[in-house]
Amino acid sequence: MEAITKNGSLSQTLVHCGPKSLSSFIPVRCLRFSKNPFPKKLVVTRARTSINSDHEAANRPLFQFPPSLLDDRFLSISANQSEIDSLGRDIEALKAKVSEKLVCMDVKERIHLIHLLVSLGVAYHFEKQIEEFLKVDFENVEDMNLGEEDMYSISVIFRVFRLYRHKLSSDVFNRFKEENGDFKKCLLDDVRGMLSFYEASYFGTNTEEILDEAMGFTRKHLELFVGGSNEEHLSGHIKNVLYLSQQENAEVVMSREYIQFYEQETHHDETLLKFAKINFKFMQLHYVQELQTIVKWWKELDLESKIPNYYRVRAVECLYWAMAVYMEPQYSVARIILSKSLVLWTIIDDLYDAYCTLPEAIAFTENMERWETDAKDMPDHMKVLMRSFIDLHEDFKREVILEGRLYSVEYGIDECKRLFREDLKLSKWARTGYIPNYDEYMEVGIVTAGIDMTVAFAFIGMGEAGKEAFDWIRSRPKFIQTLDIKGRLRDDVATYKDEMARGEIATGINCYMKQYKVTEEEAFLEFHRRIKHTSKLVNEEYFKTTVPLKLVRIAFNVGRAIDTNYKHGDGLTYGGIVEGQITSLFLDLITI
């Protein structure tokens, strides 16, 4: 479960910085590159403990984690149910007006509106309508693009179709090239077009060279545009997109940012803006209620008085993670299920990584495999943790039993056991000083990335996820496998330094250095190259997958949650990385 639980630092990346005022929509982000070079060292050769040590307990791999973001600011907030009900009525009234717009517009205008609905976080209200329109419109897309020379428009059309799994050819961008293959100089005069073209490049696959070129070309010039003579709100929007593209960012964060940007656009649609603001406030109040539920559950669990303080308490951070997977209000129960699971997975991951001895890790894994509350051969605190974990799943069963979906929880339990078996292998490597080669490491690492388990638990609270959805995960489809690899790579880069500090020398970076005889710097550069390559594979498999779009999107969003939390460091361990985003969702309620 490392892909959601560890820390590290990442050189040569954009970092999030700026004021954290509660009066702003989201903290300003600015561009800053690390000046710290990678040390040119080779592999650490031995861990500090041995499987035969007589002093296992004395040599626990203790590690001091930073505190949670959950403080009095979050504990004091509340949501008024009457306000939620009132906002719900307003949403229904405005929804009808927006739906009319979708029907009455011509094809190109409608696609631009769909792009706005997605960016503002309200497209989920019209998903069936949108899918039906785009299915028909895609058949006539060549006529739609004929003679179109506006880069912004072409990029928006490209992004919308690809988002809804229609693979519009990237050849549409050839019109923006000179005969010598360079992009036309006149494109630099269209800042919004350049930004949209940059966003479009994130939908590329490994066979689309023009989108690789577009990403480099547009990013280079967008960085120059920031702080230039452009409008302040446009510069701020560019900063946000350069920090995380819409394709990488959590939808809920992207929507919050885009609403602020759109409000300051001169020609914004007042009805659409009002609808987006009311809808976002409606969602925020649901999130506040969910946080209250999770905090209440955590306090009643009272693990802090029952087990040693070796772990991270990450209630608000785990809910933020779940919100990145699905933001819609109708998935409140699903978010709570996923959040509670994430909270306990994090503690169990810390048990394996940062506290238990090897005999304890073996006993814990064997008892989890039996799935019985009368655990044997374990310290009392581990028995308490195991009972809490099993009891949580009994709660989940009660939640889904009336829907006839007990299989969803049973499948989730199987995924947990699979993960714990692989976690034990990592523990053995760490405690015995074994450094596998990279290929051997990845066989374990793609499981401990936790993607399969996270997708499975994300489906538990979704009534529309039937048995076939879980069978799909069990079949280990290539789409999920590529997400596994991407999650593993992101985690390995972000958590490397902390893992080494804990004596976990069998890290992805270290194993790669060992197998290929390269320096740390070279290993990091290769991992970044592989992340980019794997992101394109994810896109390719997204287009190929025949599972219902809603379910594929949830799995895809698990990958976005990885990007949101790990692209610029370990946001789950070091909450300051994502504090601005979390603050903007829970504490800075949007003003209507």
Curated annotation (Swiss-Prot):
Q: Which residues bind Mg(2+) 2?
A: D349, D353
Q: Which residues bind Mg(2+) 1?
A: D349, D353
- Gene Ontology CC entries for this record: chloroplast
Q: Which residues bind Mg(2+) 3?
A: D491, T495, E499
Which InterPro entries does the UniProt record give? Isoprenoid_synthase_dom_sf, Terpene_cyclase-like_1_C, Terpene_cyclase_plant_C1, Terpene_synth_N, Terpene_synth_N_sf, Terpene_synthase-like, Terpene_synthase_metal-bd, Terpenoid_cyclase/PrenylTrfase
The transit peptide extends across 1-52
Coarsely, its chief localization is plastid
Q: Which cofactor does it need?
A: Mg(2+); Mn(2+)
Residue numbers covered by motif DDXXD motif:
349-353
Could you tell me the keywords of this UniProt record?
A: Chloroplast, Lyase, Magnesium, Manganese, Metal-binding, Plastid, Transit peptide
In the record, biological process GO terms are: diterpenoid biosynthetic process; terpenoid biosynthetic process
Compartment(s) of residence: Plastid, Chloroplast
Q: Where are the transmembrane segments?
A: none
Enzyme Commission code: 4.2.3.167, 4.2.3.168
Enzyme class, spelled out: lyase
**What Gene3D superfamilies does this protein map onto?**
Farnesyl Diphosphate Synthase, Terpene synthase, N-terminal domain
Q: What does this protein do?
A: Involved in the biosynthesis of diterpenes in roots. Possesses dolabella-3,7-dien-18-ol synthase activity and dolathalia-3,7,11-triene synthase activity in vitro. Catalyzes the formation of dolabella-3,7-dien-18-ol and dolathalia-3,7,11-triene from geranygeranyl diphosphate (GGPP). Does not seem to be involved in sesquiterpene biosynthesis.
The entry's family comment says: Belongs to the terpene synthase family. Tpsa subfamily.
> Domain note for this entry?
The Asp-Asp-Xaa-Xaa-Asp/Glu (DDXXD/E) motif is important for the catalytic activity, presumably through binding to Mg(2+).
Mind telling me what this protein is named? Bifunctional dolabella-3,7-dien-18-ol synthase/dolathalia-3,7,11-triene synthase TPS20, chloroplastic
Per the record, the gene is TPS20
